[in-house]
């Protein structure tokens, strides 16, 4: 029995194409002829073993029983190797096919057949153990690849979720900073408008007072000129009036100067406050630019992660193809070619990538679903550029 025929044991019964009746009968007839030749040769030699020869008619009857019960023997051998039946059942089957063994009377032909059968069974069992071990190794390797692919996919999904959460937080902070900045700008503009109005009023008041002082000086000069043309009056009367007028005007001038000093102090305070607001505005603008730079960095990191994800997927597909090529070049490829389609294990090295492509992919920004990873990446880049 060859290695190719040994794989039939995996099923419940052997294929008719692999074990035809004509071939079985020809093998039985050939074995019968060999047994007859062995008996003829041993009859010419002195007996060395205490055994009684069996007649030719009994040998022919055993061949007929072997021909009719070959399928049952094959099934019992398969069940015994697979551990489905006990050794006693197989012994009873052998004794039923070789009745001479029960009476300790066996021909050389039966002994040779029994030895060949046991040799074939042992070789078949060893081959099945090797095939089962190989298939178990392939199964473990496939499970390991699938688990690694699932772990990578889970890690990438978690990282995308973290990036999405950070983007959402930065977006909220950006909106809050914009609102605060707009509010402060409005306050600064309102305060600046009020200060401009006060400065205009102060300028008008100072200009009015200055014009009044100039007019009074002109009047004083005119009065001095007219003083020479008029008749001299008592000096003490005119001097007292003029002194009172000068004192009064001096008081007005001092009062205007004091108000001017107060307004200047108010203007300085407003300028200091304006400088503080300006510094706050510049700091906020710097923070906003910093946040924009961090956002660009996060976008670059996200795109690099997407490229790295694509490279890993392509590398995984290439490794699956390489493993598939190696598996087809193994020495067991010739043996597996004779398996039936329902008995042949199907190894799909690209199963992880196909399951990844069959699952629905969603955009982390707009939650739009896609079927292809490349389309999703281009859409995510467009969404990030829009935002």
From Swiss-Prot:
UniProt-listed Gene3D superfamilies: Nemo cc2-lz domain - 1d5 darpin complex (1.20.5.990)
PROSITE patterns xref list: ZF_CCHC_NOA
Gene Ontology terms: cellular component: cytoplasm; cytosol; nucleus
Keyword field: Coiled coil, Cytoplasm, Immunity, Innate immunity, Metal-binding, Nucleus, Zinc, Zinc-finger
Bias-annotated ranges (Polar residues): 325-337
Subcellular location: Cytoplasm; Nucleus
Parts forming coiled coils: 60-331
One GO BP annotation of this record: positive regulation of defense response to virus by host
UniProt keyword Coiled coil present: yes
Binding positions (Zn(2+)): 363, 366, 379, 383
Region ranges (Leucine-zipper): 302-332
Ranges annotated as CCHC NOA-type zinc finger: 355-385
Entry's Gene Ontology molecular function annotations: K63-linked polyubiquitin modification-dependent protein binding; zinc ion binding
Region annotation (Disordered) ranges: 324-358
Functional summary from the UniProt entry: Essential signaling component in transmitting the lipopolysaccharide (LPS) signal leading to cact degradation, which is required for NF-kappa-B (Rel) activation. Required for antibacterial immune response.
Quaternary state and interactors: Interacts with IKKbeta to form the I-kappa-B kinase complex.
Protein's recorded name: NF-kappa-B essential modulator
Organism in which the protein naturally occurs: Drosophila melanogaster
Lineage, broadest ranks: Eukaryota, Metazoa, Ecdysozoa, Arthropoda, Hexapoda
């Amino acid at each position: 029995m060859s290695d190719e025929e040994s794989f039939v044991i995996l099923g419940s019964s052997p294929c008719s194409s692999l074990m035809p009746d004509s071939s079985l009968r020809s093998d039985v007839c050939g074995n019968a002829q060999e047994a007859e030749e062995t008996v003829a040769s041993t009859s010419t030699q002195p007996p060395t073993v205490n055994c009684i020869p069996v007649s030719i008619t009994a040998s022919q009857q055993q061949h007929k029983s072997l021909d009719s019960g070959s399928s049952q023997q094959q099934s019992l051998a398969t069940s015994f190797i697979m551990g489905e039946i006990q050794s006693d059942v197989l012994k009873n089957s052998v004794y039923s096919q070789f009745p001479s063994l029960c009476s300790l009377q066996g021909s050389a032909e039966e002994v040779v057949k029994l030895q060949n059968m046991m040799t074939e069974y042992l070789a078949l069992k060893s081959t099945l153990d090797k095939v089962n071990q190989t298939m178990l190794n392939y199964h473990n390797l496939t499970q390991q690849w699938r688990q690694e692919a699932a772990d990578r996919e889970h890690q990438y999904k978690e990282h995308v979720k973290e990036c999405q959460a950070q983007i959402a937080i930065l977006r909220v902070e950006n909106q809050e900073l914009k609102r605060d900045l707009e509010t402060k700008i409005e306050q600064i503009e309102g305060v600046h408008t009020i200060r401009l109005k006060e400065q205009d009023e102060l300028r008008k008041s100072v200009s009015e007072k200055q014009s009044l002082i100039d007019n009074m000086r002109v009047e004083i000069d005119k009065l001095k000129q007219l003083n020479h043309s008029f008749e001299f009056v008592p000096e003490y009367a005119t001097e007292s009036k003029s002194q009172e007028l000068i004192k009064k005007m001096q008081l007005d001038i001092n009062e205007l100067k004091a108000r001017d000093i107060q307004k200047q102090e108010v203007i300085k305070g407003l300028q200091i406050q304006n400088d503080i607001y300006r510094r706050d505005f510049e700091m906020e603008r710097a923070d906003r630019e910093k946040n924009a730079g961090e956002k660009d960095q996060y976008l670059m990191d996200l795109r690099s992660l997407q490229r790295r994800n694509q490279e890993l997927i392509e590398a995984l597909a290439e490794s699956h193809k390489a493993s598939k090529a190696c598996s087809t070049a193994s020495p067991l490829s010739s043996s597996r070619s004779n398996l039936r389609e329902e008995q042949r294990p199907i190894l799909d090295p690209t199963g992880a990538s196909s399951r990844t492509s069959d699952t629905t992919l969603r955009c982390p920004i707009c939650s739009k679903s896609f079927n292809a990873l490349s389309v999703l990446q281009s859409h995510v880049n467009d969404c990030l550029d829009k935002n």
